[in-house]
């Protein structure tokens, strides 16, 4: 059977421009998901195209993804990224992956030994918040997690990502091999420290001596990742097949924009990612906060309220004047003043985000973005709210976003249709929803300490603002609530250069007030 590895592809398809036979597994990556395929692997492919080298990627999946891995092997570890822009699509065949391992197809033993090979310099991860096995209330290793319990009892046969990495580092140390860099590429705040806490927490439970060695020898760079990559669908895979003239079950579609900011702290070398446009910096935090609050915060706002209002895709929300204006104002009047970043035009950044959101080719579903909200709400909205509370400044759209999440997880949209809520806390949330009336819903959901810390729950201003926003959605529906909030909140009736000037002045004053 022909695959993209053996078929003759159209001339407009970008193919690998390097000798794939030279590749070795210098990067071992947990999580062959959509985002990794269209982001880290693609940027590594770019480096190989221009610089050559042997920085191959071995893809790892543990207890799922065996079918995808089988399909990847059948096409010589090649797959397609279809960049979809307003001016057309660009298919790119990625060749940076040189092998893959799966616990079902291969074995856990084979996976662990792969990490112990001498050439491995980087272990990277896209495993979502859940994969790090961190207790969100403490930021420490969750020792009640079933996989962590198993790994502590059977450390040489681990089932979790932290357990596997610690066991691999233990074996490398015993064999006199150098350590590797652990690189989180997940879209979570302070991801370098998150994975470091997970690894050191696991190592400390096993052996304080091992934990000390890891602390001294292993680096955990922070990263900021940005690219809109919707989950693959039958429709997107068919579009890729049309572009190639042959099916690619591992293919993925995404927007043209891509950004990766990395703390330049690697103990065993790295690809020359900067030649592919990656920003290597000393401190990732300002970039991370900008992206989490302005992009992800407005994305979540549109996802919850847009879904409730009947919008299937983010681009549909952008066709609505009220939702578009709300997203812009949320970014510039509520989120931007909470940031500490220099040499970045935040108004230009916000305008570029609106253009990206409006891309109709992506078909990024509001339902997909609304998933796992309990894990996302704190960094995307609640941190900004804390800053506003401390400054006594206004945050009506952030309040509406939080209330929108509460309405969404209550399980019924504005048309009365049931919502398929996907969240790690779904059972807890469902129990609270079922035991509370609509008038009690806010106080019930605020009891979720995994999301809402005491400093917020005990703040009357916070509770009152969320209650009012909830009542607006419950009474008027999400769309009308957005319009009402825009009408009632302070706004700037300007456009173009004048709006940019006024917003810049407001940002300057907010920073000045904070410094005072």
Locate the predicted segments by residue.
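Substrate/ligand-engaging "lid" and interaction regions
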Residues: 1-494, 512
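Positively charged N-terminal leader segments that act as targeting/secretion signals
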Residues: 493-506
């Amino acid at each position: 059977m022909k695959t993209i590895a053996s078929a003759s592809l159209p001339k407009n398809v970008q193919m690998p421009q390097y000798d794939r036979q030279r590749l070795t597994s210098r990067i071992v990556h947990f999580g062959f998901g959509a985002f990794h395929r269209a982001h880290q692997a693609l940027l590594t492919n770019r480096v190989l195209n221009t610089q050559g080298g042997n920085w191959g990627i071995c893809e790892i999946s543990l207890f799922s993804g065996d079918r995808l891995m089988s399909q990847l092997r059948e096409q010589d570890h090649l797959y397609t990224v279809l960049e979809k822009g307003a001016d057309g699509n660009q298919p790119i065949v990625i060749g940076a992956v040189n092998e893959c391992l799966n616990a079902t197809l291969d074995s856990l033993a084979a996976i662990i030994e792969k990490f112990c090979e001498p050439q491995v310099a980087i272990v990277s991860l896209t495993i979502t918040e859940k994969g790090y096995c961190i207790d969100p209330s403490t930021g420490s290793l969750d020792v009640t997690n079933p996989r962590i319990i198993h790994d502590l009892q059977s450390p040489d046969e681990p089932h979790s990502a932290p357990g596997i990495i610690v066991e691999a580092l233990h074996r490398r140390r015993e064999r006199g091999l150098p350590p590797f860099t652990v690189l989180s590429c997940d879209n979570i705040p302070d991801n370098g420290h998150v994975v470091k806490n997970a690894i050191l927490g696991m190592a400390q439970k096993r052996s304080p001596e091992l934990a000390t060695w890891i602390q001294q020898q292993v680096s955990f760079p922070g990263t900021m990742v940005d690219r809109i990559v919707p989950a693959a669908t039958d429709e997107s895979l068919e579009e890729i097949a049309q572009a190639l003239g042959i099916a690619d079950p591992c293919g993925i579609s995404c927007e043209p924009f891509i950004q990766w900011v990395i703390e330049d702290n690697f103990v065993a070398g790295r690809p020359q990612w900067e030649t592919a446009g990656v920003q290597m910096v000393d401190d990732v935090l300002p970039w991370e906060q900008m992206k989490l609050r302005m992009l992800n915060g407005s994305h979540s706002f549109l996802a919850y309220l847009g879904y409730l209002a009947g919008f299937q895709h983010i681009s549909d929300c952008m066709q609505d004047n009220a939702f578009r204006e709300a997203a812009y104002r949320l970014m510039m009047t509520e989120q931007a003043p909470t940031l500490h970043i220099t040499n970045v035009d935040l108004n230009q950044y916000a305008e570029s985000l609106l253009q990206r959101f409006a891309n109709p080719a992506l078909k990024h579903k509001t339902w997909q973005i609304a998933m796992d909200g309990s894990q996302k709400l704190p960094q995307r909205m609640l941190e900004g709210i804390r800053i506003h509370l401390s400054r006594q400044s206004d945050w009506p759209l952030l309040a509406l976003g939080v209330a929108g999440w509460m309405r969404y997880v209550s399980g019924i949209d504005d048309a009365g249709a049931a919502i398929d809520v996907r969240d790690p806390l779904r059972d807890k949330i469902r129990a609270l929803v079922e035991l509370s009336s609509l008038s009690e819903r806010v106080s019930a959901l605020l009891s979720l300490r995994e999301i809402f810390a005491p400093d917020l729950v005990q703040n009357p201003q916070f509770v009152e603002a969320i209650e009012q926003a909830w009542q607006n959605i419950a009474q008027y529906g999400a769309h009308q609530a957005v319009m009402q909030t825009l009408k009632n909140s302070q706004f700037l009736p300007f456009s173009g250069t004048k709006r940019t000037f006024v917003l810049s002045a407001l940002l300057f004053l907010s920073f000045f007030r904070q410094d005072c």
